[in-house]
C-alpha cells in the first residue's frame, strides 16, 4: 500500500497532464478555427449586405416620412436600425479576427423613389440575400468549429427571416387590397 502523500502526488500529476492536454487542444482549435478565410469573407459579405440595407432603408424612411406615410416610415426606420445593429455585430466579429474589412461596397439602390412596389420588392430581395449569407456563414463557421460566429449569426438570420415575412406580407396585402388602399393605411 502506497503512502497518502505519494497517491496525492500521482493524482496531482495526472490532473496537471490532463489540463496541459486540454490547453493544447484549445490552443490548436483557436489557431485553426479563427483563421478560416471563408468565414471571414462571409462575415464581410454579411457586413456589406447589412450596410447596404441600412443605407437604403434610412433613405426610404426619409422619403416615406416626407410623402406622409408615417406608419410605413416608422416600420422602415425600425428595420434600418435593426440592420445597423446587424452591421455592427459583423464589425465586432471582424474586429475580433483583426482583419481589414474596408472598403465596404455600397451600391446605389435599384428602386425608383416613387415606385412603392419596387421599393418593397427591393427590400424583400435584399433581406433574402442577407439570409442566404447568414446561413452560409453559420454553416462555414460550424464546419471549422467556430461556434461563437455561428451563434452570433443566428439572431441576425432570425431578423432577416422576420424581414422576409414582413415584406412578403406587404406584397400580399397590396395584391389583395390594391396599392392605393395599402398606402391609405400607412398615413
Language-model regions, residue ranges each:
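Iron-associated oxidoreductase/ferritin-like identity signal
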Residues: 1-187
